[in-house]
Regions:
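Core catalytic region of metal-dependent phosphoesterases/phosphodiesterases
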Residues: 2, 16-112, 178-191, 214-215, ...
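Short, hydrophobic/glycine-enriched beta-strand segments
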Residues: 2-8
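Generic enzyme active-site microenvironment
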Residues: 6, 52-53, 81, 167, ...
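Conserved catalytic scaffold of divalent metal-dependent phosphoesterases
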Residues: 9-14, 86-177
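Active-site environment of divalent metal-dependent phosphoester hydrolases
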Residues: 10-17, 57-62, 84-92, 111, ...
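Short amphipathic alpha-helix with an adjacent loop that forms part of the alpha/beta core around
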Residues: 40-41, 153-157, 233-234
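Short, Asp-centered acidic motifs that coordinate Mg2+ and/or phosphate
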Residues: 48, 163-165, 193
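Short, basic/aromatic-enriched C-terminal tail that caps enzymatic domains
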Residues: 216-234
Length: 234
């Protein structure tokens, strides 16, 4: 059993949603077909895939449901975290009863493949040049949500040893050499590996955190960065 990650699928199967992705460049051409092909070739039914947000362009759950059903039909268990564009996300208890292979994760940790998966959406961090007082409220709330999930993972880890893997949708820090509350929390809880999405385009790829900083490995897993190939974590 293996653990993979890929985010920012940006699906729009519903007839009520018109969001073609190929307008964003060649990495997005035929992206749904490319993802299906690479997923089917990589992920087995007993594996798990973490999806750190931006799953569907739907504004309502009914509009996102065809996208989620398509994901449900792919091999493996899926752990889905909320992203910036997941405006359809509403009523997690109800959502978690809708699909056989999908678990929606919020304010908690999930045991998976000998590891403990936890995280939150995140937000832009105080080092961002456009950071405002309104952003500060959301940022602090997201730090609290991350800590809640890390606390649960730490309790699970006390009962049975296993790696804690952190998940964010936003990058953990806006500027590579800055430091954020998200990073501090990952350090405090001994998290050695974090995945995130949200970042797109060649300039974005160059200017986002990747690799080991302060003892934690940061991995960008947005669809276009991975070219649709799920990243194997375990």
């Amino acid at each position: 059993m293996s653990l993979f990650a890929i985010g920012d699928l940006h699906l729009s199967i519903s007839n009520d949603v018109d969001k073609p992705m190929d307008i964003y460049g060649p990495r997005w051409a035929g992206h749904m077909e490319n993802l299906e092909k690479k997923w089917q070739a990589t992920v087995k039914v007993e594996d798990t895939v973490i999806i750190p947000g931006d799953v569907s362009w739907g504004l309502k759950l009914s509009e996102a449901e065809p996208d989620l059903a398509w994901i449900d039909s792919l091999p493996g268990r899926k752990l889905i975290f909320k992203g910036h564009h997941d405006l359809w996300w509403n009523g997690i208890t109800r959502m978690n009863k809708m699909f056989e292979t999908i678990t929606f994760v919020q304010n908690k940790a999930v045991a998976c493949e000998g590891a403990y998966i936890c995280g939150t959406r995140g937000w832009i961090t105080p080092d961002n040049d456009e950071y405002t007082e309104a952003d500060d409220r959301i940022y602090k709330r997201e730090c609290l949500r991350l800590e809640l999930s890390l606390q649960e993972a730490a309790l699970m880890q006390q009962e049975k040893q296993g790696e804690i893997i952190g998940v964010l949708h936003y990058p953990p820090v806006s500027k590579i050499n800055s430091f954020s509350g998200f990073q501090q929390l990952f350090m405090d809880y001994g998290v050695r590996r974090v995945i995130y999405g949200h970042v797109h385009g060649e300039e974005g790829f160059r200017n986002t955190i990747k690799g080991n900083y302060h003892g934690t490995d940061y991995n960008l897993v947005s669809y276009d960065y991975l070219m649709g190939q799920p990243l194997k974590l375990l």
